[in-house]
Design a protein with these regions (language model features):
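A beta-strand edge to alpha-helix "cap/lid" segment located at domain peripheries
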Residues: 1-40, 47-139
Length: 139
């Protein structure tokens, strides 16, 4: 694995599959405006950090409030992961990729947001969750 080969490791099939399922569950929850489903994909701890388009959200309560407000302002949300690469450092899996959100606001206005993101995931209490997510809008 590139210049980081001594540190970074490719994922074994089981870990890769589990992380692909995590991504799929998150995409489905966001596209269904399912707050509980989205929150189930995230670390349930004050240590959770999301950096979304310049806004730092710390802990599940802040993320839940953000999602509640976002979903309340949208008639529909559709998320698609365009591409993603996963690798591990010890017990942590990192991912980097791009995604596209398609929104329809309550007034019918449609918009598209493309993002580049990096996240860190860990297996906590038997399930993989996002512990850090940093997304930046692509112009």
């Amino acid at each position: 694995m590139s210049d980081l080969g001594l540190l970074a490791q490719d994922l074994n099939d089981a870990v890769m599959s589990a992380n692909a399922r995590l991504d799929s569950r998150f995409v489905q929850a966001m596209s269904n405006k399912d707050i509980e489903g989205a929150m189930a994909c995230l670390l349930d701890s004050p240590d959770l950090v999301l950096v979304l388009f310049g806004k730092v959200l710390r802990g599940p309560a802040a993320v839940r409030q953000f999602l509640t407000e976002m979903f309340a302002s949208m008639r529909t949300v559709h998320l698609e992961i365009n591409e993603v690469t996963h690798w591990s450092f010890g017990e942590t899996v990192f991912a980097v990729g791009t995604a596209t959100y398609e929104f329809e606001a309550l007034d019918g206005t449609k918009s598209t947001l493309k993002e580049c993101w990096t996240d860190a995931r860990q297996k906590v209490a038997g399930r993989w969750v996002y512990v850090l997510d940093h997304a930046t809008q692509i112009p």
